Amino acid sequence: MSTYAIIDGKMLQIGDQFDHYQIQAYMAQGGMSDIYRAFDLVNRREVVIKIPDQSMLGDPAQFERFQRELEVMKTLDHPTILKGLGSGKYNRVPYLVTEFVNGQSLRALIETSAPFPQEQVLSLIRKIADGMAYCHKNDVIHRDLKPENILITTDGQPVIMDFGLALTKGAHRVTYSNLSATMGTPDYMAPEQIEGQRGDQRTDVYALGTIMYEMLVGKMPFTGDNNMAIMAQHLNGTAPRLDRVNTSISPQLAAIVATCLARNPDDRYPDMTALIEILDHSENADLTILEKVNSSTGSEKSLTQLHAIKGVLIAFGIMGGLVLLALGLQYLHR
């Protein structure tokens, strides 16, 4: 990806005018787009402009992701959702305009301040869940909820952004060549996403549970040397209970997060509204959950592990999958 967007063969620079917007600063790369802070010369306000990378323009699937974000943002209006202000084309290059939010990403805060106090986590997660409940009521599933896609304003309010992977009612399936750019981020992907399913409200519940886990202990529930290893953990592993990782975390809160992170979607909270209700009554509610013990042994355990390996291979669409699968079989029979 270019460091700056290239328009008609010329690199977009600070101070340049792009349509009726004056470029003020280069902010970041997001997905397959370049993101700028700009000044709207017509409406006299600061905005953010998202311009797709040239490589995206030649990739129908990636361009579909950009177009999907345009459509989704037109339908949403909520305090915790980044507000879309418009879109257009300039010199044949499409762009998306959103409000400018003065703050920083939740990722930046986690890197500098995690772990966070329980009360702070519950307050923030409650607000994020409220925004996601609004999305779900409007038939929008985010499917890429992660700290990088959540801004925290200077007064501590969360703002959810980047709906490029969102699933909407009646949306057709798009085939992508790049898994991580399409299905989500491996660290926050629900098992059903890894298996190639489209997902539903419970997919976002899983991602939010992962964010809670990371905020509370400063580490991910699943780790690995590479994306495949991380995805295999999501498919077949069980995250260590939070109250065992950090004994200061209440068993009730640990139970909430464990329920969000259940491998089987049917074992999670059915939607964000149910999660909000539990969070609101966490001090008094009976949050006891049954611990599921993996009693698989011998060939049953091997079959479970093999299923995880195959699921990751299918999700990645690896050309050399048969070779890796053979290595997996050899490992299981050692």
Q: What residue spans do the PLM features occupy?
A:
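Activation-segment/catalytic-loop signature of the eukaryotic protein kinase fold
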Residues: S87
